[in-house]
A protein has these predicted regions:
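Compact beta-sheet-dominated domain cores in extracellular/mature segments
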Residues: 2-7, 11-104
């Protein structure tokens, strides 16, 4: 029982958002795994190790995150409004290759 409690506490810690990051992407569903914090109005033309491996997203209020299926802002796109997306919509799990975090 003690091991289960410690595991749950660690899982909650890993899912905590990075302070001040208006957009954040995560390798696994439910905000788990490796994450990358994206600053206000920052664009990432390539995602490195997270290319085609993003499965959840957080977007701060007054921000939008535009995701692209291909590197260099190419291919089909989708836009995530403010909120927490523990799972991504159909067709976008493990499909994001570049993105913009646009904030007012």
């Amino acid at each position: 029982m003690r091991g289960a409690v410690l595991t749950l506490a660690f899982a909650n810690f890993a899912a905590a958002p990075v302070a001040g990051a208006p957009c954040e992407v995560f390798e696994h569903k439910y905000f788990a795994g490796e994450s990358v914090a994206i600053e206000r109005n920052q664009s990432l033309p390539r995602l490195g190790r997270l290319n085609d491996r993003i499965s959840s997203v957080k977007v701060a209020s007054q921000c939008l995150m535009v995701a692209f299926a291909d590197e260099e802002y190419r291919g089909i796109t989708t836009t995530f409004g403010p909120g927490e997306y523990a799972t991504l919509p159909d067709g976008w799990d493990d499909q994001i290759s570049s993105l913009h975090c646009n904030c007012r």
